Curated annotation (Swiss-Prot):
NCBIfam families: tsf. One of its GO terms (molecular function) is translation elongation factor activity. HAMAP family: EF_Ts (MF_00050). This is Elongation factor Ts. InterPro entries: EF-Ts_dimer_sf, Transl_elong_EFTs/EF1B, Transl_elong_EFTs/EF1B_dimer, Transl_elong_Ts_CS, UBA-like_sf. The lineage of its organism: Bacteria, Bacillati, Cyanobacteriota, Cyanophyceae, Synechococcales. Belongs to the EF-Ts family. Keywords: Cytoplasm, Elongation factor, Protein biosynthesis. Pfam families: EF_TS.
Amino acid sequence: MAEITAKLVKELRDKTSAGMMDCKKALIENKGDMDKSIEWLRQKGIASAEKKSGRVAAEGAVGSYIHTGSRVGVLLELNCETDFVARGDLFQGLLRDLSMQVAACPSVEYVSVDQIPESIANKEKEIEMGRDDLSGKPDQIKAKIVEGRIGKRLKEMALLEQPFIKDSSINVEELVKQVAGKIGENIRVRRFTRYILGEGIEVQGPDFAEEVASMTLG
């Protein structure tokens, strides 16, 4: 029997998008054989999300999450293929987890990197190109550094790229694929909106001189 190493588990996970524990169990059950482990996961419905990705997901639900203190709220639309699945516990649990994820990640503004407008990417590039630590560097080196920084920044803005708040060993995209595999339907995060109490409202603070005067008189 082949040794079930972390590298082997990661390789299976990369090929199937299944969870780490599922991959480890599959490898143990199949004595480390990669092909048999992939087939085992497919039979269990864990590694089948990719095959379903081309099917239309027009059903689903809009979920909400209000954070403790009622200062942050999220609305998120999650799509699937049938109304039956949309009403199920797995789908509803995913909907709530994703809504919580958006509430916990204030820098996230888009579902995926692909949705980020080119104008935003260009603006980020402009900002990075102007940073002091790049001055004097050759253009080729500067371009590589900027490309890496922009890629990281754009990922920070995309929901699917975020580490899952309940299990940082996977990201949100992998979580969606895992649930899709278990459910047996294509699942797609379509859009979300975050509301922050008081956002955009200019609060007029007390006049400092008047505050000092009142304290002195008191």
